[in-house]
Swiss-Prot record:
ATP binds at residues 686-693, 1319-1326. This is ABC transporter NFT1. Residues 311-621, 961-1251 form the ABC transmembrane type-1 domain. Glycans are attached at residue 4. The keyword Glycoprotein applies. Signal peptide: none annotated. PANTHER family: ABC TRANSPORTER ATP-BINDING PROTEIN_PERMEASE VMR1-RELATED, ATP-BINDING CASSETTE SUB-FAMILY C. It comes from the Eukaryota. Residues 1-29, 125-130, 191-201, 324-351, 471-481, 580-584, 975-1013, 1106-1109, 1221-1222 are extracellular. Residues 410-434, 892-926 are annotated as: Disordered. It is a multi-pass membrane protein.
């Protein structure tokens, strides 16, 4: 009996009558009345005072404030609000009519309750009712308060009482709080009624009616949508689905997602089926709130500050859940005591214990679910914050090398930034590459965000550990501290393991960066790699890095094994030490009740110990990743917004000196003073490497400004500029030398966020000579350009990039050599119709070019650059007198001006003939321009068995899997035997004197024998369990090594068309996220699944063996378990696949931003790109959010099912108490306790395996892609010996549905003949090279080289036998030597020889090198040529070289090593004419006996060749000597020469060549 003064709380097995009257009926209701009344009064008074001014149905407004977290306003999320709202609208999820009707029912129940109170109060006798009257009066006042509250909630819909809306949610909260509290208070009196303790009929009726009404009211509110909560949604279109309005029941049990789960069960889900996110979970809201709460400084404190409310809530929920989880353990000794002696306690009391176990577990489950879901929601929000900040940083990051490190470098560092790079590569302090930057977003951001899930688990682990130790102390006394000290002794070992694990993780991330950088570089240059037959070279380089990763993964597995062994053996060691001390030193008897209660606590303790181990490991990984993100966010940012000065009258430089980086060898622009002529065409010319592109980048503010000033029209964001009457804004548009396109349609790339105007669009297409190409494409302007424009020819890419600049509303255009990639006819047309046509009215245009005769013809201002200095500038007519080369070019052009204008008009007219078909024919030059808009496919249904079998085959087949599962059964059998051994030991008796306990003989054995056996069983079990995990991970690592090699080989050797239609970001997703999942998550989850299934089966068999009646409960419970699992698995599978697909666009946007950051900043379009990233993040977050909700949905239900198993087991035990011994009951209950966790773990792990297997499916899909067809006949070693090439009736198309790129092409090239291939852009010129290299399979026809059909020759041999200089000069990360000779086949002399031939080094360079070697103190930084040192660094893509230097280096690479056939695809387009002439001379002199096929837009480059092949519409139109063709006015070649602007020179050169060969 528990007493409180004169009033006992508890009498034997029930609440006392005085306690019920004092507390249940008076004090507790009074507390509810006072708190509810005060809270409601405060909220109503405030709402009345404010008159509802703050209530709105719209989305919450974000005030335009901030703390300067971002340096520039254009990157502020708060400033994005207006842009976001302009493309979205608010939708409000209002309450249903049925929900509104429920309020009237609610009011009726309250009136009924008041009526019952009045009736009972008037009918009860007046004697001995001191507390009774007070209690009834308090409860009456409480119900009157609730009647007032429901009245206010009902009248809120009236216009006269709209102010109530402001406090409607608070009034609803008062009602729910009161109903829930009253129902909870009514439970114990109701129990008293059921067990017969209350016998007064009126009181019985009152208690039953009160409980029923309280329950009814609680259910009404729990199942109705929460009042006062307007869930507003910013959605992109009206078809976006909204989730159901939230209810208390739905939020607590996650039933809100029932509809989506049921829909997924009936059919496969798509993006359209996924509900939208509410405004609080939209990225714009998350980032705005984060920005307002953040301060300048490190990321970690800002994250903690922003999520502090989440952390506090999780802390509270973890405390409640942890405490309630131990209630069953606290009640277990009482139940076992009853089993041991059924007469010691009443059955009513024991049933209360069992019921309390059920209720406590349900509440603990609810709290745990809410805590975990808060963490998962925080994971999504943190991921949003990190990805958005990384993306925003990418748009702010400088394209220059970090000055903080460059200053520390030795001045003799190899070469630095290029003078003419248009899209330079961003860099990090530690030489971070763009490709590794992608890992910061795709891997590190995800790892850090996952740490949000660990906070709740960490708190729960700490609370559970402390609570368990406290209970153990109360159970075992001070001997529990012995176990505690043993537990503490393991912590340093754990941290030692964690330290090693963290170090290995950091090293692995470095190698992962290196691997993904290599893969990204290979994917971006795959065409060139195939042309050079370097697939195996890149394969080996990447595999070597991968091998280092594998070694680190195995080291991590070993550390994980040790860590697992420590914590798995911990409970056994702790229990053994505790029991020994309890018996020996405390001289106590270890009874089954105490032993198995302690074991149940130790079993529960194992969970937090495991959580601590895994949490520490994950937190270490997260902190490493967070540091990498912080390093990235700390990198230098562009200073363009500081150094650029706004001017309405001046556009140019004033005595400006600029550099790429602070190094003596860095290229510099010195003392630049240029005042570009407004509303005019300004041209910049100069030799290769003179600094033309650097000058334009300097004008955009991308270079370091050392001195002087730079004047631009504006530095404002594009969205903030006013549109003039002419539709223009004072902004700049930039077209880089290397065209940058986004993944999307042609229309998307041209319109580029501007308002679409069809007439303007058509005019731009026509002026950029794209209208005919568009007509030839099946999808027209909706044709997908592919990843970075991969599905277009180089000329088409350049013209689309130009069209983007022309279509923009910018009044100032900056064009970097945008005419070099197109043929002369097209270049002339674009120049006349676009750059000098009506589209340029009122615009200022600055253009750089090597085509001097063309661009200076109608330029108003001319700037001549050389070696970073302005040599001269002025009107072209004034510069003729002082510049002989310029004068000769312009004079030559003037002779042909009349002819050119006439021919231009004639060609423009002729292009409109032939039923509208473009004269150039097919617009697929290199690859199919009609490529479909390929969306990433989503697997449907469950993961196919073939995927599991495919993975199992790498392990050695299904037999190995069977052996592995069987070992799990055996190992857990050993684990269970430990409990039976303890029961056997206790049954034999373990008490004795303190001095003789260890040596007392029991049945022929001492107690030390039993203790050591107990420890050995635990040690063997732990070692086998941990060893099985280690073997699984090591085996999995070997498997992932094979899978990666297969995937890499499949991608590298895939047909080029696969790369044309598949975005690089999508492929990289396989190599980064999917591969990381297989590396580190899949195999441990498989192992955990097999272990959990075995444990559950053992538990069910054990309980069924002890209490066969349990099977009656087990069958429906298993059916329920199967049902919810099936529902969940289908939904989670679909949601995960959609999540996987929706992640790829984020990768794609990030990759595009890295490549095009200069263009984006030039257009001042950062805000739009940030908005696009937020939209992509929201699309990715939606399935991720509902996937997490579905995960908690199944977790909650599995926990409830597990609780029912525990409840039914306990019921069976107390029902069979007279037939069971306490030891067996203890074993059964101990295992029943762990069933909930194990069953939950099964579904979690199985669903994780299913979700993770989607990554296996995705990788398997890419390992099954068709590879290039290889030949089988190896030619002789000296093949090709002569170099004869013949094409017969060759037809080629790039996709089954596209038109032919080559149509019945036939021509023959004799050995040593030099053939120039000409024709307008898209005529099929590059397709000839593609056919010869077998980059695409042709439909029919043959190609023979030295009379051997190349279709039967192995690809590597074929491609190694031909030299090629591709259209896009592609270089790789490494050195000059590694780019020229990666296999180390040639000497330095040979390499210097080819560098000299292409003009990259001269004799004076060699003298400088000798002089430096002889006189170390001599400094020749200003004179020394960077290519002298063959170990000079070349950045990925050659980003630290000018376009011309890249082309020359590629030319040198092809000339290194004599081959009898060379194919040149527009290799000199980006170098000046003088250098071009020298190179052509070199080719003629050094390759006299080499068969050369050259694609050229510069006709001068091929005018002295042996033959000219004219292509049109994929057909051979003309094939003869240049002089023969140019002499015939009816030939296409004649027209091309006329339109080139240098007809007279071409004619003379052709005639001289013809005469010399006659």
């Amino acid at each position: 009996m528990i007493k409180n003064g004169t009033c006992p709380y508890w009498e034997r097995d029930d609440l006392s009558e005085c306690a019920r009257r004092e507390y249940i009926e008076f004090k507790f209701p009074l507390f509810i009345l006072l708190t509810g009344m005060i809270y409601a009064f405060c909220k109503v008074f405030r709402a009345f005072y404010l008159r509802g001014k703050n209530h709105t149905n719209e989305a919450p407004e974000f005030e335009e404030q901030g703390n300067g977290n971002h340096e520039y306003a254009r990157f502020s999320v708060l400033r994005l609000k207006s842009a976001w709202e302009s493309r979205s609208f608010c939708n409000v999820n209002n309450r249903s009519t049925f929900d509104k009707f429920k309020k009237f029912i609610e009011g009726a129940f309250i009136v009924l309750q008041l009526t019952i109170h009045l009736y009972i109060l008037s009918s009860m006798p007046m004697d001995n009712k001191k507390f009774f009257h007070q209690g009834f009066l308090v409860q009456m006042f409480l119900w009157i308060l609730l009647l007032v509250v429901i009245t206010l909630r009902l009248i809120s819909a009236s216009q006269s009482f709209r102010w109530v809306l402001a406090c409607k949610r608070d009034l609803w909260a008062v009602s729910f709080y009161s109903y829930a509290s009253l129902f909870t208070l009514s439970i114990l009196p109701l129990r008293s009624v059921f067990i017969g303790k209350i016998k007064d009929k009126i009181m019985v009726k009152y208690i039953i009616s009160e409980t029923f009404i309280d329950l009814a009211l609680l259910l009404l509110l729990s199942t109705s949508s929460i009042e006062g909560t307007r869930y507003s949604f910013l959605v992109e279109n009206e078809n976006k689905k909204l989730p159901p309005a939230p209810t208390v029941f739905g939020l607590l049990t996650f039933s809100r997602i029932d509809r989506l789960i049921w829909k997924a069960y009936k059919h496969c889900l798509g993006n359209a089926d996924i509900w939208d996110l509410d405004i609080n979970n939209k990225s714009i809201a998350i980032l705005a709130n984060f920005e307002m709460s953040s301060k300048k400084g490190r990321l970690l404190p800002n994250i903690i500050c922003y999520f502090k409310a989440v952390f506090i809530s999780q802390l509270f929920l973890a405390f409640v859940s942890s405490f309630l989880n131990f209630v069953p353990s606290l009640l277990m000794p009482r139940i076992l005591s009853y089993v041991n002696d059924p007469k010691s306690k009443s059955w009513n009391l024991v049933s209360l214990y069992v019921s309390s176990m059920l209720v406590s577990k349900i509440i603990a489950t609810t709290c745990r679910g809410q805590g975990l879901f808060l963490g998962e929601k925080g994971t999504m929000q943190l991921r949003t914050v990190l990805i958005s900040n990384i993306y925003s940083k990418t748009l702010r990051r400088t394209i220059l090398k970090d000055s903080t490190t460059s200053l520390q470098k030795n001045a003799s560092t190899s070469f630095e930034e290029n003078p003419d790079s248009s899209e330079a590569e961003p860099r990090k302090k530690s030489s971070r590459k763009d490709n590794s930057v992608n890992n910061v977003m795709s891997i590190d951001a995800f790892k850090v965000s996952e740490a949000m899930n660990t906070f709740y688990l960490a708190c729960e682990a700490v609370f559970m550990t402390v609570t368990a130790l406290m209970i153990l102390y109360s159970l075992l006394g001070w001997s529990a501290f012995a176990g505690t000290f043993a537990l503490l002794a393991m912590i340093p070992l754990n941290f030692w393991c964690a330290t090693f694990y963290g170090n290995y993780q950091a090293d692995q991330l470095i190698l992962t960066d290196k691997r993904t950088s290599g893969i990204s570089e290979a994917l971006n240059s795959i065409r060139v790699i195939k042309l050079l037959a370097w697939e195996n070279l890149f394969y080996q380089k990447i595999i070597n890095v991968r091998d280092g990763e594998i070694r680190l993964l195995k080291k991590k597995a070993t550390i994980f094994f040790l860590n697992h062994l420590i914590w798995f053996f911990g409970p056994t060691l702790v229990s053994a030490i505790t029991f020994s001390v309890f018996i020996k030193f405390q001289n106590q008897t270890l009874t089954p009740t105490i032993a198995f209660t302690a074991l149940s606590l130790f079993a529960i303790l194992r969970t937090p110990m495991d959580q601590i181990a895994s949490t520490v490991s994950l937190l270490i990984q997260s902190f490493i990743s967070l540091e990498r993100i912080q390093d990235y966010l700390n990198e230098s940012e562009t200073r363009k917004y500081e150094i650029l000065e706004q001017s309405n009258t001046k556009f140019g430089f004033e005595d400006a000196s600029m550099e790429w980086e602070a190094a003596e060898t860095s290229f510099k622009l010195k003392n630049i003073s240029i005042d570009f002529k407004l509303n005019s065409l300004n041209a910049i010319i100069g030799p290769t490497g003179s600094g033309k592109s650097s000058l334009l980048l300097g004008l955009l503010g991308e270079l370091n400004l050392l001195s002087g000033k730079i004047y631009v029209p504006t530095v404002e964001s594009r969205d903030d500029l006013e549109i003039g009457k002419d539709g223009m804004t004072n902004s700049m548009a930039y077209c880089s030398q290397t065209p940058w396109l986004i993944s999307g349609t042609i229309k998307d790339n041209v319109v580029f966020g501007e308002i679409f105007n069809k007439q303007k669009f058509d005019d731009v297409m026509k002026s950029c000579c794209l209208d005919k190409d568009i007509k030839a494409m099946t999808a027209g302007i909706r044709t997908d350009v592919g990843d970075g424009g991969f599905s277009l020819s180089g000329g088409q890419q350049q013209r689309i990039a130009l069209a983007r600049a022309i279509y923009s509303s910018s009044r100032y255009l900056i064009l970097d050599d945008c005419l070099s990639a197109v043929d002369p006819e097209t270049a002339l047309y674009i120049y006349e119709e676009c750059l000098c046509g009506p589209m340029m009215k009122g615009r200022t245009c600055i253009i750089t070019s090597h085509n001097i005769s063309l661009v200076t013809k109608r330029a108003d201002w001319l700037v001549i650059l050389d070696r970073g200095e302005v040599k001269s500038q002025g009107k072209p007519s004034d510069l003729i007198k002082s510049n002989e080369f310029l004068r000769e070019s312009i004079n030559n052009d003037s002779k042909n001006t009349t002819h050119n204008q006439i021919d231009l008009k004639r060609s423009t007219t002729s292009k409109k003939t032939k039923n509208g078909d473009p004269e150039g024919g097919n617009s697929q030059d290199e690859v199919c321009a009609e490529v479909e808009n390929f969306e990433e496919t989503k697997m449907e249904g469950s993961v196919k068995f073939s995927a599991y079998k495919w993975l199992a085959d790498y392990f050695g087949g299904l037999g190995v899997v069977f052996v592995f599962t069987s070992s799990s059964i055996l190992i857990h059998g050993i684990t269970l035997s430990q409990g039976f051994w303890l029961r056997y030991w206790l049954d034999t008796g373990s008490s004795g004197s303190k001095s003789t306990w260890l040596y007392r003989i029991v049945e022929g054995h001492s107690n030390i024998y039993f203790l050591l056996t107990y420890i050995i069983i635990g040690l063997v079990s732990s070692f086998l369990t941990s060893g099985k995990v280690w073997i699984a991970i090591i085996s999995g690592t070997n498997v992932t090594k094979k899978i990666f090699a297969k995937l890499l080989s499949s991608i590298l050797y895939a047909k080029l068309r696969f790369h044309n239609v598949t975005p690089t970001g999508r492929i990289m997703n396989r190599f980064s996220k999917d591969m990381d999942i297989i590396d580190q998550q899949l195999i441990p989850n498989f192992e955990g699944l097999s272990y959990s299934v075995v444990v559950c089966l053992w538990i069910i068999l054990l309980i069924g063996y002890v209490t066969p009646q349990f099977l009656l409960f087990a069958i429906p419970l298993c059916a329920l378990y199967y049902t919810v699992c099936t529902l969940y698995l289908r939904a989670s599978r679909e949601l995960k696949r959609i999540d996987n697909i929706n992640i790829s666009p984020i990768h794609q946007l990030f990759a595009e931003a890295i490549k095009g950051v200069t263009t984006i900043r030039a257009l001042a379009d950062e805000r739009r790109f940030i908005t696009q990233s937020l939209v992509a993040i929201d699309r990715s977050n939606a399935p991720f959010f509902y996937l997490n909700m579905a995960t908690e949905w199944i977790t909650y239900r599995v926990d409830i099912i597990g609780t029912l198993v525990l409840f039914s087991s306990s019921v069976m035990i107390i029902m069979k108490a007279s037939y069971l011994d306490a030891g067996l009951a203890g074993i059964l209950l101990s295992n029943a306790f762990s069933f909930t966790e194990t069953a939950q773990w099964i579904i979690k792990v199985f669903s994780s395996v299913e979700l993770l297997m989607s990554s296996v499916e995705r990788i398997k899909e890419y390992t099954d892609i068709p590879s290039e067809s290889n030949g089988y006949i190896s030619p002789p070693a000296n093949w090709p010996q002569t170099g004869d090439v013949e094409l017969k009736n060759l037809s080629l198309r790039y996709s089954p549905h596209s038109s032919k790129a080559l149509d019945n092409v036939s021509f023959k090239v004799k050995a040593g003949t030099k053939v120039g291939i000409v024709g307008r852009t898209g005529a099929g010129k590059s397709s000839i090279i593609a056919a010869i290299y077998r980059l695409s399979d042709w439909e029919n026809g043959t190609i023979t080289i030295d009379n051997k059909d190349i279709k039967h020759i192995p690809l590597e041999r074929l491609r190694n036998s031909i030299s090629c200089i591709p259209q896009d000069p592609t270089l790789f990360d490494g050195t000059v030597r590694s780019n020229l000779d990666p296999f180390d086949r040639y000497s330095d002399v040979q390499i210097y020889g080819v560098l000299s031939k292409v003009g990259l080094i001269e004799e004076c360079d060699e003298l400088c090198l000798i002089f430096e070697q002889e006189q170390p103190n001599f400094s020749s930084h200003k004179l020394r040529n960077r290519f002298i040192d063959l170990n000079t660094v070349v950045k990925s893509g050659g980003s630290n070289l000018s376009q011309g230097q890249r082309q020359l280096l590629c030319l040198a690479r092809s000339m290194l090593g004599a081959r009898n056939i060379m194919l040149i695809d527009e290799a000199t387009a980006s170098i000046d004419y003088i250098s071009d002439a020298k190179i052509q001379k070199t080719i003629r002199e050094t390759m006299k006996n080499t068969t050369i096929l050259t694609i050229a837009h510069r006709l001068r480059s091929v005018i002295d060749y042996d033959k000219i092949l004219v292509m049109e519409m994929g057909r051979v139109k003309e094939y003869d000597h240049p002089y023969t063709l140019i002499s015939d006015r009816n030939t296409i070649f004649y027209r091309l020469c006329r339109q080139s602007g240098e007809f007279e020179n071409l004619f003379e050169l052709a005639k001289v060549s013809f005469d010399n060969k006659r």
